[in-house]
Every structure is written in C-alpha cells, then in structure tokens.
C-alpha cells in the first residue's frame, strides 16, 4: 500500500507531509523549501507556473497570476465575500453555474481547478522525494468551512489525481501534530490565523482521544486582510501626495501587495520598516516613486479591529464549549499570521497565560494531516478523532423558517431523522431546501441545495408523514434524504456544494489536468533536448574551428549541413523533443565519423617512424 500524504492547502502557502518510521515529517518541494506558495500563473507562451516560479513573475503578469483562490472556494457569485474578492483581486472573477470562477485568456477555470494545480505540484514533489507514486491524501480545511467549501476542496483533490481519504479540520490536525493526544486529559485551545481564514477551536485531549468541544471562526479573515490594510494606507497616502490612484493600475497594485506583505513580515521583528517602490507609476510630469516609513505602532493601529474580532470569537467559542478560560491548559498558535506581535499579545492577554509556539506554525497542520493519514492506514493505533460540525444544518419550513435537524457542535459522523408534513391539502410534492447556518430565517442562511419528493397521495394537510434524514460523514460532507412513510417513496441528494460541478464535469477536469501534465512533461523534455542540442552545436563548431585545414572538404560539408539543419529546427519554438533529437543524431553521426577519420590519420605511422621503431630492442635498463 502506497504512503498517505498530509496536505495543508493554504490561502497563501501550502505544505505536504508524510508519516514514516514513527514520525511525521515535512516534504520539501523541488526548490528545497518546506512550503509552496499557493500561486498559479498562466504565461503568454501557454505555460502554467505553480508555486515560487508563479509568485516571482506576478508583478509583470498580475491579471494572469492567481493567488488567494481559497477565498472564493465554494462561493456563489452573489455572496458578499465574492463581491469583496472581486474588488480586491487583480484577476477577473466571473461565474460558472452561479458559482465563483475566474477567466484567463477567454477560458473559465473553477477554484477547484486552480487549487488542483497546487495540489498536483505537492503530489509530484512528494513522489520525487519518496521515490514512489502517491495517490492517497488527507487534506485539511478551516474548521469553519461550510459544506460547499469542504466539497469543493475534495473535488480539487480528485481533479489533481488524488484519492482524498479524509477532509479534516486544521485545528484538529494541529492538535495531533503537537502530540496533545498523548497527554493527560486536558482542555486546549487552537488559535489558527492563516493567510485567508481564521478558526478558534476548543478541544479535550487524553487517553489517545482528541475531541472537539466547540469551534468557530471566519472563513474570510486572515493575513491577506492585514496586507490589505497596509495597501489601502499606502495607496491613500500616495493619492494624497500625487493625486494618482494606484488601485486603478493592476501592475502597481501587485507591487503594493508584495511590499505590504514584506512590510508586515519585517514589522514582526522590527519597530519600523521602509517601503520603497521606485517608478511605481508616471504622469505628465514624469515618473513617480513611493517612499514611506511605517512603524509597528502605525501598523497595529490599522489591524487592531481585525485582531479584536478574533478575540471576540475566542470568548464565544470558549463559552460554547461550556468552559471558563481558567480551565484551558494550553493555547496552541497555528498559521503564519500568528507571528504578528499584536496577535500574540492579545491572545496571551485574553487567557492570562503563555502561548504554546513549539512547532512551526506554517508546517504543523500538514504534519497533523499526515498523522491522520497514518491513523486511517493503520500505522498509528488507538488514536481517535472526534470532530464536530461547525454550523447547524436544517431545512426550510412553513413561513421561510429554518428548522434545525443537526445542531452546530454535533460530533461527526452523525445521522439524524425528523418527521415533517405537508402545508396544504392534497399536496402531492414537497421541496426540501437544505440550509446551513445559525439564523432563524432561511433567507439569512446558506442554501446548500434542494430537491423534490413527489407522488405523495392526496390527503388533508398535516396528515402525510415525511421523514427527512441528515447524514454527515467523517469528512463533514452531507447527504440528505426524504421518505414518504405511507408509500415508501424516497428521494436522496448528496449535497454537491456551491461548485455546481457534476460528476461528469469533475471527470473531464481530471482528464484535462492529466492532459496538461503530459503537455508540461513534453515541454520540459523539449527544453532539455534544446539545451543538449545547443551544447552539441557549440562543441562541434569549436572542433571544426580547432581542426581547421585538417578536415577534408567532404567531411566539412557534411558537418555544416547537419549543423544548419539542427540550427533551423532550434529556431522553431514549438519543435518537439523527437524533432530535435533526430537532427542531433545526424550531427552526432557525422561528427563521430570525422573523429574516426582524424584518429586514423594520427594512427598511420610514417616510414621514418616505422624504421626507427624496427631498430628498437626491448631490454631492461639498470
């Protein structure tokens, strides 16, 4: 059985890990780094870049460089978070089947397809590191991800060619990575602030059991929002000074984004930093430069409202768990944004105790995911994860009210039934609208999907008995069924989430991803062949020059023709590996023939040399 990899598919960076020989370890990417930027770029040459190479060229290619795609994963285009993303991100967000998608060079891509390209790179890096094929994976999601977002994440894994064994919550994975499952029974809080999402989870650990007591968060709050505060400040200051709005210039905006991200990182260890962006734009008077000094105090004043929101969520979740803060033994800090000093200070103040920062916050979630993979595979025994559903689930009933069937905080997997009836006399069908959220009315919650149960026999309202069953699996993904008890007629819907992707569409995307993988392989082989050909041309031309008059006219003509043919092929940017290698073979053969001829000439002894050799007597000399 092949190894199971654990993947933290992050908003800003992603990480992959594996459990081997009793421990979980992070797998470095081909560039030698432990984390890979969750960035995908489409170049004018038709190449698709992923990770560091994509991030490096973002400034010169902002509209076709995709980052923070996790922020629109599983979102409908009409949701507020989608509208916010459209205003913030430089690439073109559009819709497909009502769900968020992006448009690049006239082609529509879903967030699942973009995320799949990041996952494919992580998969390939893992295969190169382990020296074997990898298919099985455990992928983490923020604890507060809804059903649509979880399903979309699983689809991304499928498109990438992975068999997703489990979708688990990031804080739960972090608890495993810290080894907290092995300690005495105690209550802990995992505070997870990443690039685009925030979660706080209260867990109880002990006797090899990790049980989630309560969870909460914001799927649209993270380090990106800290960056955006800096971007807004820098753009506003520049506009006041020059009258130019940098937000209307996508290339300038991308430079601002990178500068803001770097400033945020520097202010984690320094009290002030300088932002210098020469030639950021130009007007009739000439080029303009942006230069600004930002102090840590100024930065903290920009983000204190966001940090306060996370502290408010801590109080809410600890209360949901039925605990007092004094009962919490450890506070585990997860996610790159927890490096911000203000975040650490406020969380420490909220609990009145030191924070647990013993594991790299960028890697801890992937490490935990690999441990969960080992649990599923059977390499790690006697560890039990008891996760919960982050939001209540129910259906729409008379008056547009949401009737909850599964309350938030219910341990999963779980299955619950509830019986309903008709609202009108002789009603022959009912529509089941499946909802997720905490509000009283359907319109204020997220609709996950709906289906009809038809063929109900005519009867006065309130008489038919319709049993609705909600079944949540270990991934937190929901299946809903409805059955008329009188006739036994039933209808089932596996909630596919907001992605709106059918099984056929997902399969087509899998094939498309494989096709691109094959295209990328061929392109890489052609580049390698081109490099070898350039070396061969240089080597043969050098040899011809050095040998000069020693080369016969016939040999020279043959070699020159083979050289010209190869050079002509290399001028074609689309030349395949096979075409290049065919011309290389011809050149190699004629140049080898030349070498043989030259060698034979050197070997042929002259008459004088032969005569001298005949006079030589073999003897030992004292």
Swiss-Prot record:
<dbReference type="GO" id="GO:0005524">
    <property type="term" value="F:ATP binding"/>
</dbReference>
<keyword id="KW-0067">ATP-binding</keyword>
<keyword id="KW-0143">Chaperone</keyword>
<dbReference type="InterPro" id="IPR012725">
    <property type="entry name" value="Chaperone_DnaK"/>
</dbReference>
<keyword id="KW-0597">Phosphoprotein</keyword>
<feature type="region of interest" description="Disordered">
    <location>
        <begin position="515"/>
        <end position="537"/>
    </location>
</feature>
<dbReference type="GO" id="GO:0140662">
    <property type="term" value="F:ATP-dependent protein folding chaperone"/>
</dbReference>
<dbReference type="InterPro" id="IPR029047">
    <property type="entry name" value="HSP70_peptide-bd_sf"/>
</dbReference>
<comment type="function">
    <text>Acts as a chaperone.</text>
</comment>
<feature type="compositionally biased region" description="Basic and acidic residues">
    <location>
        <begin position="575"/>
        <end position="614"/>
    </location>
</feature>
<protein>
    <recommendedName>
        <fullName>Chaperone protein DnaK</fullName>
    </recommendedName>
</protein>
<dbReference type="InterPro" id="IPR029048">
    <property type="entry name" value="HSP70_C_sf"/>
</dbReference>
<feature type="compositionally biased region" description="Basic and acidic residues">
    <location>
        <begin position="515"/>
        <end position="528"/>
    </location>
</feature>
<dbReference type="InterPro" id="IPR043129">
    <property type="entry name" value="ATPase_NBD"/>
</dbReference>
<feature type="region of interest" description="Disordered">
    <location>
        <begin position="575"/>
        <end position="622"/>
    </location>
</feature>
<feature type="modified residue" description="Phosphothreonine; by autocatalysis">
    <location>
        <position position="197"/>
    </location>
</feature>
<keyword id="KW-0547">Nucleotide-binding</keyword>
<keyword id="KW-0346">Stress response</keyword>
<dbReference type="InterPro" id="IPR018181">
    <property type="entry name" value="Heat_shock_70_CS"/>
</dbReference>
<dbReference type="GO" id="GO:0051082">
    <property type="term" value="F:unfolded protein binding"/>
</dbReference>
<comment type="similarity">
    <text>Belongs to the heat shock protein 70 family.</text>
</comment>
<dbReference type="InterPro" id="IPR013126">
    <property type="entry name" value="Hsp_70_fam"/>
</dbReference>
<dbReference type="Pfam" id="PF00012">
    <property type="entry name" value="HSP70"/>
</dbReference>
């Amino acid at each position: 059985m092949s190894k199971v990899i654990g993947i933290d598919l992050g908003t800003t960076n992603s990480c992959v890990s594996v459990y081997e020989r009793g421990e979980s370890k992070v797998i470095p990417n081909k560039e030698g780094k432990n984390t890979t930027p969750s960035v995908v770029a489409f170049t004018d040459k038709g190449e698709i870049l992923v990770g560091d190479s994509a991030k490096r060229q973002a400034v010169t290619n902002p509209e076709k460089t995709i980052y923070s795609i996790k922020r629109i994963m599983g979102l409908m285009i009409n949701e507020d978070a989608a509208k916010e993303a459209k205003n913030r991100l430089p690439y073109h967000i559009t819709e497909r089947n009502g769900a968020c998608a992006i448009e690049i060079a006239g082609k529509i891509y879903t967030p699942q397809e973009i995320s799949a390209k990041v996952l494919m790179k992580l998969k390939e890096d893992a295969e190169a590191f382990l020296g074997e094929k990898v298919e099985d994976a455990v992928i983490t999601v923020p604890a507060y991800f809804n059903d649509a977002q979880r399903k979309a994440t699983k689809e991304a894994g499928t498109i990438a060619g992975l068999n997703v064994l489990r979708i688990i919550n990031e804080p739960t994975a972090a608890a495993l990575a810290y080894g907290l499952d092995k300690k005495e029974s105690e209550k802990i809080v995992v505070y997870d602030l990443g690039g685009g999402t925030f979660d706080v989870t209260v867990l109880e650990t002990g006797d090899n059991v990790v049980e989630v007591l309560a969870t909460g968060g914001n799927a649209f709050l993270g380090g990106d929002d800290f960056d955006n505060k800096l971007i807004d400040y820098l753009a506003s200051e520049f506009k006041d000074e020059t009258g130019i709005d940098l937000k209307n210039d996508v290339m300038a905006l991308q430079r601002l984004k990178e500068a803001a991200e770097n400033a945020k990182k520097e202010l984690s260890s320094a009290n002030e930093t300088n932002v210098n962006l020469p030639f950021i734009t130009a007007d009739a008077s000439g080029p303009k430069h942006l230069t600004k000094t930002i102090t840590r105090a100024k930065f903290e004043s920009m983000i204190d409202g966001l940090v306060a929101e996370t502290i408010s969520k801590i109080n809410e979740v600890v209360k949901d768990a039925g605990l007092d803060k004094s009962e919490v033994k450890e506070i585990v800090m997860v996610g790159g944004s927890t490096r911000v000093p203000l975040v650490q200070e406020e969380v420490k103040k909220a609990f009145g105790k030191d924070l647990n920062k013993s594991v790299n916050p960028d890697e801890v979630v992937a490490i935990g995911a690999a441990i969960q993979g080992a649990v599923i595979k059977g390499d790690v025994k006697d560890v039990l994860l008891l996760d919960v559903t982050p939001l209540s689930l129910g259906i729409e009933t008379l008056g547009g009210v949401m009737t909850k069937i599964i309350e938030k905080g219910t341990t999963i997997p779980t299955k619950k039934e509830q019986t309903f009836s008709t609202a009108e006399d002789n009603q022959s069908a009912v529509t089941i609208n499946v909802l997720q959220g905490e509000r009283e009315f359907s319109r204020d919650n997220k609709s996950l999907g709906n289906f009809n149960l038809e063929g109900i026999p005519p009867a006065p309202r309130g008489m038919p008995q319709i049993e609705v069953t909600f079944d949540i699996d270990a991934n937190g993904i929901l299946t809903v069924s409805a059955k008329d008890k009188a006739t036994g007629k039933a209808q089932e819907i596996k909630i596919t989430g907001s992605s709106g992707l059918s099984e056929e569409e997902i399969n087509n995307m899998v094939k498309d991803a494989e096709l691109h993988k094959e295209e990328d392989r061929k392109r890489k082989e052609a580049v390698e062949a081109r490099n070898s050909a350039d070396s061969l041309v240089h080597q043969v031309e050098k040899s011809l020059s050095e040998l000069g008059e020693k080369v016969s006219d016939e040999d020279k003509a043959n070699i020159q023709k083979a050289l010209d043919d190869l050079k002509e092929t290399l001028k074609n940017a689309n030349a395949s590996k096979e075409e290049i290698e065919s011309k290389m073979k011809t050149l190699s053969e004629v140049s080898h023939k030349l070498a043989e001829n030259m060698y034979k000439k050197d070997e042929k002894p002259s008459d004088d040399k032969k005569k001298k050799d005949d006079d030589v007597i073999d003897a030992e000399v004292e």
